[in-house]
């Protein structure tokens, strides 16, 4: 009787160890798969509750106003004029993660537009901000673009300064027009694009 009980306990211990090892291996493999995939492929807000044509990522151009102003442009290779940039919404510069793999170590809500834009809602029953761009770079890094070399561009003057590397951006676009605070729902677009600046009055930026 004692031998049978000991054998039974030993078999249960082996079974538990086997289940634990299998679960750990499965989680490790899942993490490895995630690290090999672009983050935006796992982003639910890019494809849900959108009208036809919305939520599809394209290689669009983007014009930004340097003095805390920004207006995303969604058609491919489009550029805003200075007047259009001047009438757009504010832009926030935020610290950058060290690598794309670092995103997986944090809650995905860190880059979700609905989470980030919630901090901008101050009063109820106001029109939701239509579009907004977050640049996840140190402000001094953005300013340093003006210390680079001049290149041709489509902004006013035809000459711009190009960033030495693509900048990390989160583009937020209102999912449906006519929404009012606090019920604002945004689509999230995560990308990296090079920034071009005129640097004349530091009011124009373009990213491609």
Swiss-Prot record:
What does the record say about tissue specificity?
A: Male-specific expression in proximal caput of the epididymis (at protein level).
**UniProt keyword list:** Cell adhesion, Fertilization, Glycoprotein, Secreted, Signal
Q: What happens when the gene is disrupted?
A: Mice are viable, anatomically normal and reach adulthood but display impaired fertility consequent to an inability of the spermatozoa to ascend the uterotubal junction (UTJ) canal of the female reproductive tract and gain the site of fertilization. Spermatozoa fail to establish a strong association with either epididymal epithelial cells, the zona pellucida of oocytes or oviductal epithelial cells, yet they are capable of fertilizing eggs in vitro.
- Main subcellular location of this protein, as a coarse class: secreted
MF (Gene Ontology): nucleic acid binding
Record flagged with keyword Metal-binding: no
Listed InterPro entries = RNaseA, RNaseA-like_dom_sf, RNaseA_domain
Q: Which GO terms describe its cellular component?
A: extracellular region
Attached carbohydrates are found at: 125, 147
Top-rank taxon, per record: Eukaryota
Which GO BP terms apply? epithelial cell morphogenesis; heterotypic cell-cell adhesion; male gonad development; positive regulation of cell-cell adhesion; positive regulation of flagellated sperm motility; regulation of fertilization; seminiferous tubule development; single fertilization
Look up the signal peptide feature and give its range: 1-24
- Cellular localisation: Secreted
> What does its PTM field state?
The N-terminus is blocked. Glycosylated.
Secreted in keyword set: yes
Give the family this protein belongs to, as stated in its UniProt record: Belongs to the pancreatic ribonuclease family.
Query: What job does this protein perform?
Result: Secreted proximal epididymal protein required for post-testicular sperm maturation and male fertility. May be involved in sperm adhesion to the egg zona pellucida. Does not have ribonuclease activity.
Task: Spell out the protein name for this chain.
Answer: Inactive ribonuclease-like protein 10
Question: Which organism does this sequence originate in?
Answer: Mus musculus
Q: Which gene encodes it?
A: Rnase10
């Amino acid at each position: 009787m004692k031998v049978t009980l000991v054998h039974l306990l030993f078999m249960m211990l082996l079974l538990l160890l086997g289940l634990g090892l299998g679960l750990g291996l499965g989680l490790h493999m899942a993490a490895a798969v995630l690290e090999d995939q672009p983050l935006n492929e796992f982003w639910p807000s890019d494809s849900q509750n959108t009208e036809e044509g919305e939520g599809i990522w394209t290689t669009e151009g983007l014009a930004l106003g340097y003095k805390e102003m920004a207006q995303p442009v969604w058609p491919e290779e489009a550029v805003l004029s200075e007047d259009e940039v001047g009438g757009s919404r504010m832009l926030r510069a935020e610290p950058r993660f060290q690598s794309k793999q670092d995103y997986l170590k944090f809650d995905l809500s860190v880059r979700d537009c609905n989470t980030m834009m919630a901090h901008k809602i101050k009063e109820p029953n106001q029109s939701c901000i239509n579009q907004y761009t977050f640049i996840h770079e140190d402000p001094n890094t953005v300013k340093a673009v003006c210390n680079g070399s001049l290149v041709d561009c489509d902004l006013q003057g035809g000459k711009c300064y190009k960033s030495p590397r693509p900048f990390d951006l989160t583009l937020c676009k209102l999912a449906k027009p006519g929404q009012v605070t606090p019920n604002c729902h945004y689509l999230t677009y995560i990308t990296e694009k090079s920034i071009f600046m005129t640097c004349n009055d530091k009011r124009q930026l373009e990213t491609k």
